[in-house]
């Protein structure tokens, strides 16, 4: 687990956008999310397309997530361009 935390902190904030993450702490433990932004060095903004939409995202501490290798370029482009269909794309992913 420490390895993942170090890896997450070493990534640039823009590198995290579009990455799929797994929550490993809290009520949402085991849920998958897509990183749609960052608040600070320790917090990211997450969305799953259904319960946590782009308009009402979840904020989560970097220590409480595991970053998976999955990233979809279409979703990343949609997040960056603030496309209206982003929630649907995230939900289908």
Q: How should these model regions be labeled?
A:
Residues 29-31:
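Short N-terminal binding/cap micro-motifs at the start of the first secondary-structure element
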Residues 2-17, 24-25, 34-93:
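Ferredoxin-like alpha/beta domains used as RNA- or RNAP-binding modules
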